[in-house]
A protein has these predicted regions:
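N-terminal active-site segment of His-dependent metallophosphoesterases
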Residues: 1-48, 52, 62-76, 82, ...
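Active-site metal-binding loops of divalent metal-dependent hydrolases
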Residues: 7-10, 35-37, 58-61, 99-100, ...
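A generic local structural motif
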Residues: 17-21, 40-43, 81-83, 100-104, ...
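Glycine-rich phosphate-binding loop signature in dinucleotide/nucleotide-binding domains
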Residues: 23-27, 89, 109-110
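Short connector loops at helix/strand junctions that flank enzyme active sites
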Residues: 50, 82, 89-91, 111
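Conserved beta-sheet core of the metallophosphoesterase superfamily
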Residues: 54, 93-95, 99-161
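Ligand-binding grooves and catalytic loops that recognize ribose/phosphate and carbohydrate rings
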Residues: 55, 59-85, 129-135, 142-143, ...
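Residue-level detector of beta-strand face positions
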Residues: 86-88, 125
Length: 164
């Protein structure tokens, strides 16, 4: 199963559209968003994606009430999990959080095939035992290189996608 992984949109809609287009083109029917919509506008754009998008909140999400309203009333494919999520795909457990401090701790437990996080705006991949800890970088492009990732549940590996 191919999962689209992305984080830190910060209202950068052009790069968000690129990421969603790549996910659709490459066959990722389920996406994981590691936080920081910022305003509710990206939630509307993400809601147009045909598949499920599992989302956690980040520190930059100012109007969580409006984002939740959009998800619950207008775009039920947006699955809001609060500050963190524990998901299962094809018999494997995955954890999602915005914050790297918590992600590293979760990855260290040995309970997850992979843990996904954001916040730093810096792409990183680390193996902690058998667990892959992935920060897909930032959709925003604030640090210069907008990226997202495609994660393969069979191989436990990620392909980094440059959105520039």
């Amino acid at each position: 199963m191919l999962l689209g992984i992305f984080s830190d949109v910060h209202d950068q809609l052009q790069n968000l559209q690129r990421a969603l287009g790549v996910f659709k083109q490459r066959g990722a029917a389920t996406l994981i968003f590691c936080g920081d919509f910022c305003s509710p506008i990206p939630a509307r754009v993400m809601g147009a994606f045909a598949g499920e998008i599992h989302c956690v909140f980040g520190n930059g999400d100012g109007d969580r009430f409006q984002i939740a309203r959009i998800a619950h009333h207008d775009h039920p494919n947006l699955k809001l999990h609060g500050e963190h999520a524990e998901l299962e795909f094809e018999g494997h457990k995955f954890a999602v959080t915005h914050y790297p401090f918590y992600a590293k701790a979760l990855a260290s437990t040995g309970q997850y095939r992979a843990v996904f996080s954001g916040h730093t705006h810096v792409l990183s991949e680390e193996r902690i035992g058998a667990c892959l800890w992935l920060n897909p970088g930032e959709v925003m492009g604030w640090k210069g290189r907008p990226t997202c990732a495609l994660y393969d549940t069979h191989t436990n590996a990620a392909e980094i996608i440059d959105l520039a």
